[in-house]
């Protein structure tokens, strides 16, 4: 009889173990661990069913264990010691398992060469109105348990810090230059760079934070940028780019009242030029601030904020950036900057490239233009890791977010995500180096 590993290697996605295992104190915990590990090892859905009430109890008792696991996760478990017959039902994602097997290069290397009987089973159900029992996490990059979240944040920050430590050590740089906008991404980049310099025992004054007010900069973000740099003890500089951009507009024949993409991108490229030149002057590195979600959408100016000398946030999705900043804000050593960080977290996400309102409020809000980042991160996670088709992504998002977003709105932003994801690949092909923080960032596509 084939071992279960052989069944999986031969292509079986669903492994069923019919057992007659008795119950003992502590045995169930071990059994659960064994089942979940086996499903992870074989990249399969694993069903375990053992006999229960009605069996002889001369000297042993059967609890009626029923467990369903999928790739290391316990999906459903039957009630133990029940006196009644019961049916345990769970949804398992066969497509997900098949994708994971294709991506695991070593899996196919051990495919059995001996004859194996295969019986085809159709996966499609005739029950069109089948009510799915499985739930989907709307924020797949963020652990639900507080303890796991703490561990995840600490781990990602350490990955970012050690990546930058190695880059500084390798290049021999002793200075860093960062554009500070008063937004989430540049804030996280500054926090990571400060921790890096602390670890290298370099003075924080060797970090030059530059705020570069433009046509859309608001008082709130400008104030937070200056306050954060001062409280963190880095070298602070302020260079207003408005006049330089106006001269540039005249040089290229752009009307000053033109609010086209050229108007916006010229500001981003002016800022990058300033950062690069100051880094050259000081013998330092320009630290990139763009995050994984922005890069997936191509929401960056090519050769503007898209470019740096090392992008510390390039492997961190936007929904996770907010949690990382919040985690750092809650640390005891962050007491002096906590209020500033919390205000930055509450600030609407915006590139601030178009003029603000008369009241000085942000008018250009990113999530109103390209869609909610929590939706895009949901699409990103499931599309890149599992290759789900659009119809399935739409279905899963409807299940995950419930009534928060109408079906039509989810469809609208899914179309935006897919269109931008593929059309903006040319930007990702020319990215600077940056640390891989989550396990779904290594994707190579032709442009």
Predicted region positions:
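CN hydrolase (nitrilase-like) catalytic-core segments centered on the catalytic cysteine
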Residues: 3-88
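ATP/NTP-dependent adenylation/nucleotidyl-transfer catalytic domains that generate, transfer
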Residues: 40-44, 53-56, 77-78, 95-182, ...
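C-terminal accessory region of radical SAM enzymes
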Residues: 89-93
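Conserved small/polar residues in nucleotide/adenosyl-binding loops
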Residues: 1-5, 441-447
């Amino acid at each position: 009889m084939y071992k279960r590993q052989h069944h999986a290697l031969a292509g079986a996605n669903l492994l069923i173990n019919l057992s007659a295992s008795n119950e003992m104190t502590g045995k169930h915990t071990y059994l659960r661990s064994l089942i979940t590990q086996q499903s992870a090892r074989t990249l399969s859905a694993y069903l375990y069913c053992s006999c229960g009430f009605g069996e002889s109890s001369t000297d042993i008792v059967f609890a009626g264990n029923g467990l369903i696991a999928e790739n290391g996760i316990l999906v459903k478990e039957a009630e133990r010691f029940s006196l009644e017959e019961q049916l345990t039902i769970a949804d398992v994602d066969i497509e997900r398992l098949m994708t994971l097997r294709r991506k695991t290069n070593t899996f196919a290397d051990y495919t059995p060469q001996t004859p194996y009987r295969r019986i085809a089973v159709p996966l499609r159900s005739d029950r069109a109105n089948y009510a799915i029992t499985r739930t989907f996490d709307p924020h797949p990059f963020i652990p639900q348990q507080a303890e796991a979240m703490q561990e995840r944040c600490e781990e990602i920050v350490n990955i970012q810090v050690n990546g930058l430590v190695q880059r500084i050590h390798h290049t021999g740089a002793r200075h860093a230059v960062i554009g500070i906008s008063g937004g989430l991404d540049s804030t996280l980049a500054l926090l990571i760079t400060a921790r890096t310099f602390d670890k290298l025992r370099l003075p924080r004054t060797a970090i030059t934070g530059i705020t570069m007010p433009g046509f859309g900069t608001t008082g709130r973000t400008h104030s937070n940028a200056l306050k954060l740099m001062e409280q963190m003890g880095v070298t602070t500089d302020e260079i207003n780019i408005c006049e330089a951009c106006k001269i540039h507009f005249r040089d290229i024949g752009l009307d000053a009242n033109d609010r086209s993409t050229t108007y916006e991108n010229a500001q981003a490229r002016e800022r990058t030029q300033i950062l690069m030149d100051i880094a050259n002057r000081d013998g330092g590195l320009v630290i990139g601030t763009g995050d994984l979600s922005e890069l997936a959408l191509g929401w960056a100016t090519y050769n503007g904020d898209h470019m740096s000398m090392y992008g510390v946030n390039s492997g961190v999705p936007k929904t996770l950036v907010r949690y990382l900043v919040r985690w750092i804000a809650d640390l005891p050593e962050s007491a002096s900057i906590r209020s500033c960080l919390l205000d930055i977290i509450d600030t609407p996400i915006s590139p601030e490239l178009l003029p603000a309102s008369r009241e000085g409020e942000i008018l250009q809000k990113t999530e109103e233009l390209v869609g909610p980042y929590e939706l895009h991160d949901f699409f990103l996670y499931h599309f890149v890791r599992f290759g789900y088709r659009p119809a399935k992504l739409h279905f899963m998002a409807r299940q995950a977010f419930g009534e928060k977003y109408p079906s039509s709105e989810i469809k609208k932003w899914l179309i935006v995500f897919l269109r931008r994801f593929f059309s903006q690949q040319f930007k990702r092909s020319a990215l600077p180096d940056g640390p891989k923080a989550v396990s779904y960032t290594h994707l190579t596509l032709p442009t």
